[in-house]
Amino acid sequence: MQYYGCLMIKNGDADGLVSGACHSTANTLRPCLQIIKTKPGTKLVSAFFLMEVPNCEFGENGTFIFADSGLNQNPNPEELAAIAASSADSFRMLVGAEPKVAMLSHSTKGSAKHDDVTKVVEATRIAKEEYPDLALDGELQLDAAIVPGGGRVQSAGQ
């Protein structure tokens, strides 16, 4: 089924493909990479979940993208920055709104010390440097990212 769907996209008979619930990630992505290929200049393939929460005041009227929780294992800071930018592009294209990117972590603005936190802080720095027009902040826990003022409560020393 994935091959047929990918051929339809390649031929302009479909705009997208929803897949993966009944197939492994590898079996879902393989046809896409073989038939559709990646966008020119793409160095890293990543995945995201598009979430729509009804009657939600957060996100873009309840719409969020969470990336990359399904493909890249333990990405380095440069890869995290690239994933953030790529996901922002996908959000713009699919939702038609300007993304607000949060680099998620188990720490908010230094509330915890760990190598994983350091990696997200560095990824945030890289993303801000390489994509200066992107509305981006980090490192943030999810509630601090979506609840106005939530980050002030969870930041270092509180």
What are these regions (language model features)?
Residues 1-158:
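Anion-binding alpha/beta catalytic cores of soluble intermediary-metabolism enzymes, centered on
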